[in-house]
Amino acid sequence: MYPLVHYYVNKQVFGEVSHLTALGALWPDLAVGAGGDRDEAHTRGVDFFNWCSANMPDALDAARGMIGHGIDPPCVDYYADEYWPDHIRGYMFREALPYLAQVAACTGLDGDTAISLLPPGGEPPRSNVWWKAHNLIEMSYEMITASIDPQIGTQLLESVADAKAVAILSQAIHRWLGLDAGAITDIYSAVPVSYALVDAGALAQAKVQAASMHHRFSNYNVDIPALAALLEKISCDQAEKYPIFMDLLVERTREQLKPYM
């Protein structure tokens, strides 16, 4: 999931989200840009918590944010990306299925556009279109979250702007994993331009996706207005489902975090 959803879940779980918790919740999706490993960042939150307990207790809030983002123990991204009871991947991938042809048309990405509901087990099909479509479902959740809580993007950016908190987390991850602390600091400084946070509307989200596809796929064929229109449609389609899934994320994440509170 994208940053606003993680922050929103943390607000429901913690009440008040510390800057370090917010920064820790961003880390799993930033790790690659700082020389880390995405899968490791999504599965080693508890390891980081234990390391912080022994070596750097002032970074424990960041570890809590990292745990809540990840897939082991099963928290937000586990249900969004990895597991849903009737499907081979998580809920966001399931919800993306009706939009594959439209995503292919407005992004120029290739891949199977006829993927159907697949039971758990086996190997998920590889498809750039399906992956991007699941990103758009996630972005629609950013849009809905911002409409419910208009100040949430500003609150998140206050955490990113907290140089002391960023320095604490950068040093902790540097000492834990050996990654360059400067690279970690730099990747956090890029957050305001890497995501649509204050203006989380469809056009802003579409522009972020276009920039991502330029970088990741050298794809300059994105139809930004068409992508924005598709995001608006998806957001409307997801509006009634949003509170049900978000309540589940909050409930499951709160339960998994109890041993670390």
Residue ranges, per PLM feature:
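N-terminal leader/auxiliary helical segments
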Residues: 1-67, 71-261
